[in-house]
Amino acid sequence: MKLSTYNFLTSVAIKGVKVGFPLKLTINKKEVVESEFNPTFVERILPKLDWSAVYGAAQVAELTEDIPAVQPENIVENELLLQKLHHLLFEIDVLEGQLECPETGRVFPISDGIPNMLLNEDEV
Protein backbone atom coordinates (compact mmCIF):
# COMPACT_ATOMS: atom_id res chain seq x y z
CA MET A 1 0.00 0.00 0.00
CA LYS A 2 1.41 3.35 -0.97
CA LEU A 3 1.24 6.02 1.71
CA SER A 4 -0.72 8.21 -0.71
CA THR A 5 -3.50 5.59 -0.44
CA TYR A 6 -3.29 5.68 3.36
CA ASN A 7 -4.13 9.39 3.28
CA PHE A 8 -7.55 8.65 1.78
CA LEU A 9 -8.63 5.61 3.84
CA THR A 10 -11.23 5.99 6.57
CA SER A 11 -13.28 3.73 8.82
CA VAL A 12 -16.41 5.91 8.72
CA ALA A 13 -18.43 2.94 7.38
CA ILE A 14 -18.28 1.25 10.81
CA LYS A 15 -21.52 1.60 12.75
CA GLY A 16 -21.27 4.48 15.21
CA VAL A 17 -18.09 5.99 13.77
CA LYS A 18 -18.41 9.71 13.07
CA VAL A 19 -15.05 10.57 11.43
CA GLY A 20 -12.81 7.48 11.36
CA PHE A 21 -9.79 9.45 10.18
CA PRO A 22 -6.85 9.37 10.28
CA LEU A 23 -6.39 5.68 10.87
CA LYS A 24 -3.49 4.74 13.13
CA LEU A 25 -0.83 3.21 10.90
CA THR A 26 1.61 0.51 12.00
CA ILE A 27 4.30 -0.61 9.56
CA ASN A 28 5.85 -4.04 10.12
CA LYS A 29 7.46 -4.38 6.70
CA LYS A 30 8.03 -1.80 3.99
CA GLU A 31 10.06 -1.39 0.85
CA VAL A 32 11.13 1.51 -1.30
CA VAL A 33 10.00 1.27 -4.92
CA GLU A 34 11.50 4.13 -6.89
CA SER A 35 9.29 5.96 -9.36
CA GLU A 36 9.77 8.93 -11.65
CA PHE A 37 9.30 12.27 -9.91
CA ASN A 38 6.49 14.33 -11.43
CA PRO A 39 6.27 17.69 -9.64
CA THR A 40 3.01 18.64 -11.38
CA PHE A 41 1.30 15.49 -10.10
CA VAL A 42 2.51 16.11 -6.55
CA GLU A 43 1.30 19.74 -6.73
CA ARG A 44 -2.14 18.64 -7.93
CA ILE A 45 -2.60 16.09 -5.15
CA LEU A 46 -1.63 18.58 -2.40
CA PRO A 47 -5.13 20.09 -1.93
CA LYS A 48 -6.57 16.60 -1.45
CA LEU A 49 -4.12 15.63 1.30
CA ASP A 50 -4.68 15.95 5.02
CA TRP A 51 -1.30 17.27 6.16
CA SER A 52 -1.57 15.93 9.71
CA ALA A 53 -2.08 12.43 8.24
CA VAL A 54 0.86 13.01 5.87
CA TYR A 55 3.07 13.97 8.80
CA GLY A 56 1.75 11.04 10.85
CA ALA A 57 2.69 8.67 8.02
CA ALA A 58 6.13 10.31 7.88
CA GLN A 59 6.54 9.66 11.61
CA VAL A 60 5.62 5.98 11.29
CA ALA A 61 7.87 5.61 8.21
CA GLU A 62 10.67 7.35 10.15
CA LEU A 63 10.96 10.21 7.64
CA THR A 64 10.11 13.20 9.86
CA GLU A 65 13.41 14.89 9.06
CA ASP A 66 12.14 15.17 5.46
CA ILE A 67 8.55 16.32 6.05
CA PRO A 68 7.64 19.37 8.18
CA ALA A 69 4.93 19.07 10.84
CA VAL A 70 3.00 21.97 9.27
CA GLN A 71 2.44 22.32 5.54
CA PRO A 72 4.49 25.27 4.25
CA GLU A 73 2.56 27.95 2.38
CA ASN A 74 5.10 28.03 -0.46
CA ILE A 75 5.35 24.27 -0.89
CA VAL A 76 4.86 24.31 -4.69
CA GLU A 77 7.92 26.56 -4.97
CA ASN A 78 10.08 24.14 -2.97
CA GLU A 79 11.10 21.38 -5.39
CA LEU A 80 13.24 19.60 -2.81
CA LEU A 81 10.26 19.29 -0.46
CA LEU A 82 8.06 18.13 -3.36
CA GLN A 83 10.65 15.41 -4.08
CA LYS A 84 10.64 14.32 -0.44
CA LEU A 85 6.85 14.31 -0.43
CA HIS A 86 6.88 12.24 -3.64
CA HIS A 87 9.23 9.78 -1.95
CA LEU A 88 6.97 9.47 1.10
CA LEU A 89 3.68 9.18 -0.77
CA PHE A 90 4.61 7.20 -3.87
CA GLU A 91 7.83 5.30 -3.19
CA ILE A 92 7.25 3.89 0.30
CA ASP A 93 5.25 0.68 -0.08
CA VAL A 94 3.79 -0.80 3.12
CA LEU A 95 3.86 -4.58 2.66
CA GLU A 96 2.82 -5.71 6.14
CA GLY A 97 1.20 -3.79 8.96
CA GLN A 98 -2.16 -2.58 10.16
CA LEU A 99 -4.57 0.32 10.24
CA GLU A 100 -6.59 1.04 13.37
CA CYS A 101 -9.84 2.98 13.64
CA PRO A 102 -9.26 5.95 15.96
CA GLU A 103 -12.78 5.70 17.40
CA THR A 104 -13.42 1.96 17.82
CA GLY A 105 -9.95 0.43 17.82
CA ARG A 106 -10.99 -1.94 15.01
CA VAL A 107 -7.84 -3.24 13.32
CA PHE A 108 -7.55 -3.64 9.55
CA PRO A 109 -4.57 -5.80 8.53
CA ILE A 110 -2.24 -4.92 5.65
CA SER A 111 -0.98 -8.08 4.00
CA ASP A 112 1.11 -8.29 0.82
CA GLY A 113 0.61 -4.53 0.45
CA ILE A 114 -3.21 -4.76 0.47
CA PRO A 115 -5.25 -3.24 3.31
CA ASN A 116 -8.24 -5.43 4.19
CA MET A 117 -10.98 -2.92 4.98
CA LEU A 118 -13.87 -5.41 4.77
CA LEU A 119 -16.32 -5.19 7.65
CA ASN A 120 -18.36 -7.89 9.33
CA GLU A 121 -22.15 -7.70 9.01
CA ASP A 122 -22.56 -6.58 12.61
CA GLU A 123 -20.16 -3.65 12.07
CA VAL A 124 -22.24 -1.87 9.40
Swiss-Prot record:
One of the GO biological process terms: maturation of SSU-rRNA
Keyword line: Cytoplasm, Nucleus
InterPro entries, alphabetized: Trm112, Trm112-like
Xref: SUPFAM superfamilies: Trm112p-like
Subcellular location(s) per record: Nucleus, Nucleoplasm; Cytoplasm, Perinuclear region
Every TRM112 domain range: 2-120
Coarse class of the protein's main subcellular location: nucleus
Molecular function GO labels: protein heterodimerization activity; tRNA methyltransferase activator activity
Reported function: Acts as an activator of both RNA and protein methyltransferases. Together with methyltransferase Mettl5, specifically methylates the 6th position of adenine in 18S rRNA.
Subunit organization: Heterodimer with Mettl5.
UniProt record similarity statement: Belongs to the TRM112 family.
UniProt name for this protein: Multifunctional methyltransferase subunit TRM112-like protein
Species: Drosophila melanogaster (Fruit fly)
Gene label: Trmt112
